[in-house]
């Protein structure tokens, strides 16, 4: 069963998100020397800044130097490009941390960027090579269309949801620019110890209704709930959850 937290105030959401992440960190570090986590782009990055950097009650508990950070998806653009998830995470989080408390971060290899399918497949294959078999925590967003990572709904994009061999794949037709991306596929999410979605705002109302009331598993986010619900948590605000009727998840 999926775990869902619904919050009336952003500060409460980000604080509880931070508590959740730090708990997962501590659980991992009790058993081994590092915490393997992946992040996505978009509004999730701002939530992570507020949870783990700006929240003083939590920031001192984050053992950044023991974090190994990967990216659940990335746009195939230079890392300094405004569309880069790594670049956004660097500006919002990494640049705010002291030089003595930096995590190990694994961005896409931008030196491989070309202009053809061979280059893009090579970028995905190279990233798959460095992503651990088991991540301790995968932090995810949810688009208004129900996409997560760069796994989009619709038959055009079904090849990514059906992928069982490649753990990182080239998404060559994103409906949102830039069209070329690399993305985790479902096998990575299957092997991860915990999955966590963050969704906020009125633009998410209709898709939250489809995910939680209609349980439309044609949507990648709803499919994740269906397949991996026992280890999946959602942090949402009341605005996003305004049309959801169900009380059982």
Swiss-Prot record:
InterPro entries: 6-phosphogluconolactonase_DevB (IPR005900), Glc/Gal-6P_isomerase (IPR006148), NagB/RpiA_transferase-like (IPR037171), PGLS (IPR039104). It comes from the Eukaryota. One of its GO terms (biological process) is pentose-phosphate shunt, oxidative branch. It catalyses: 6-phospho-D-glucono-1,5-lactone + H2O = 6-phospho-D-gluconate + H(+). CDD domains: 6PGL. GO terms for cellular component: cytoplasm; cytosol; nucleus. Its EC number is 3.1.1.31. Keywords: Cytoplasm, Hydrolase, Nucleus. Pathway: Carbohydrate degradation; pentose phosphate pathway; D-ribulose 5-phosphate from D-glucose 6-phosphate (oxidative stage): step 2/3. Gene3D superfamilies: 3.40.50.1360. It is found in: Cytoplasm; Nucleus. GO terms for molecular function: 6-phosphogluconolactonase activity. Belongs to the glucosamine/galactosamine-6-phosphate isomerase family. 6-phosphogluconolactonase subfamily. Hydrolysis of 6-phosphogluconolactone to 6-phosphogluconate. PANTHER family: 6-PHOSPHOGLUCONOLACTONASE, 6-PHOSPHOGLUCONOLACTONASE 3-RELATED. Present with 3420 molecules/cell in log phase SD medium. This is 6-phosphogluconolactonase 3.
